[in-house]
Amino acid sequence: MAVKSSFRNMVLCLLTICFVCSALLAGVNVLTRGPIEKGRVAKVEKAVAAVLPQCNIVSERQEIEVDGVRYGYYAARQDADYVGCAIESSTIGFGGVLSLMVGITADGSISGTQVLSHSETPGLGAKCTDPAFSSQFKGWDSSVKKLEVRSKGGDVDAITASTITSRAYTLAVANAVKAFRDINASLNGDSGEEQNEITEGGQTNE
């Protein structure tokens, strides 16, 4: 009888501990969800402003599917003039998912790129965040220069000893350029609706 009572008490104790831990975790999740989301939005807004500095009006985040892949994008204007889009594009690098924000102007040239997140090796692939590498894409005209690293016949200077990361970064940019063609066609065909969606702001291998 004492054994049964001891077992029952142990089970009740474990259940109580599990309940308390679950409640604490739920509470922490509720408390941190807001700040985390606020930080994410601020990071995106900063990236959009960095890759499309010539805009002062940015739409809410929209999505488009191209070849089975979904891309988030932000259409941008300078007052009444459409100036381009900031497009979220992700690929797999050496260490995991590599996510970029790619700015493309209305004429199709790249106005800038910025890393949103990565898991690349510090001191090697992580150098993809350095302007020494990323700045080469600014002003890029993909109709003139090939978006591929030089070792594969393209015009992109790879990061030393980080070919996989360099190729992944370049592929993310190339995919954004491809998505932009469909986005641009969609915006041009839906200009009235797009104008209504525009809001003030603009300030979201190794």
Where are these regions (language model features)?
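Flexible, solvent-exposed loop/hinge segments and secondary-structure transition points
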Residues: 2-206
